Amino acid sequence: IIKYDYLSGKAIETIFDVATAKNCTLKKISDYEFDPQEKRILILTDKTPIYRHSFSTTYYVYNITRNELEPLSQNPGVQNLAQFSPNGRMIAFARGNNLFIKKLDFNTELQITKDGEFNKIINGTADWVYEEEFGRTRYFEWSPDSKLLAWVRFDESEIKQFSFDVYDHPYDNAYTYKYPKAGETNSTVSVHVYDIENRTTKQMNCGTGNDIYFPIVQWTNDNESLAIVRL
């Protein structure tokens, strides 16, 4: 990753190099993202497509000052949608349909949901309908002061399954997922907020009815106000 001068277009600094970074065994990267303070970089490797927009990947965190690379998580399982907190001190990410927070100052990992299960419960990641129709994959958001994390929970337990054959090996295999056809049941959605300091979760009152959508959930500039678009 090379820093360029905007006016001259000349390279002025190498910010990250797989050949010189400490603890780095990578040969190439897929993508990267700076934290808001530009002290750390999220490094993405081995991106694997899932649906139209979504993908799984392996994340690393690069400390620019220390020239040091380390995995985002030491625990098994592919990671999705990692996002720095506004203060740059934490990273929220999804794994196995659950949400986690990595506290970078202490190098600790906190699991904030535990009910995630494939083809049943999804926390913070769009189900197939939301990704396809609204074009979004990440459904969790940090509050501006980095003290709260809001997310959408998708309960797709009552959705009928659909299967198709995948021909990527000598013997094809069937892929089965929840696919609501027109007129059929969609996911039951709810919005939740996790308090980082108190380690408590609250469900937001979003009105009545189950046949609804929450295409956008976003914090306002007020740390106590969460904007929810309901359809």
Where is each model-derived feature located?
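Beta-propeller folds
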Residues: I1-L231
